[in-house]
Structure formats: C-alpha cells, structure tokens
Amino acid sequence: MGKELGLTRIDYFSCMDYSTKINEELKPWVDNTLDKTVVDLFAGCGGLSLGFEAAGFKTVGYEMLEDASETYRANLIGDCFTEKLHVDTEFPKAEVVIGGPPCQPFSVGGKQLGLKDARDGFPIFLSAIERLE
C-alpha cells in the first residue's frame, strides 16, 4: 500500500499539529501591505518567498522546473515564471532579490567546477542584483 515510516500515532499527530501551526503562522498576507516586491531567482517551490509573503511582500518567482513552478503558484499568492535564467534575463522592478542558485558547481559532493559548470547560477544572480539596484 505505501512505505511504512515507523511513526507511532503520537509521532504522526505531533507532526501534524506542528505542520498546522507553521502553516497558520506563515499564511501569506492577502493584502500585501508593505507594497514592496521581492524577486525570487531559482525559486524552487517557493520556500523563501513564503516567508516574504508572510511578512507582507509581493513576490515574483523564476524557476526552470515546471513541477516546482506549479507548486509555487499553488501555494503562494505571487506568480512564478517557468524559464531558464540567463545573465540578461529581464526582471520586474523589485526592492529585494532572493534566491537559491544551484550549489552543485561548488559543493564538496561534486566535481567543484565552479564557473566552468553550466549549472553555475551565481553570475546570473549577481547580474540581477546589479541591474535591480
């Protein structure tokens, strides 16, 4: 039927209580009262944006994986564009830039090719910050 996780009923309900509490605490503000925009690069499913929306920011995400973008759009107020970012990608005006560039080019678990790795997103991230300043 499914994979057995080895949780007792008490463990399961403790996790569910915690999950419910966190979801309530991080519920995005519908009115986005701060009138400030956050651009989330390499947004994934929107974990960083979730915190900013909970604080009242408007968010705009950019993510190349369709499944992650769909999750972002399903759970957050802001939009998420599905596209592969480039150094010259245009972004909307924003007061804050956040994101999670891929770590594989620098991770000790990989080949550490750095700037030679095609997945290196740091130049894109830095370019966005410079242009949005």
Task: Go through each PLM region and give its residues.
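Conserved active-site and SAM-binding loop architecture
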Residues: M1-E133
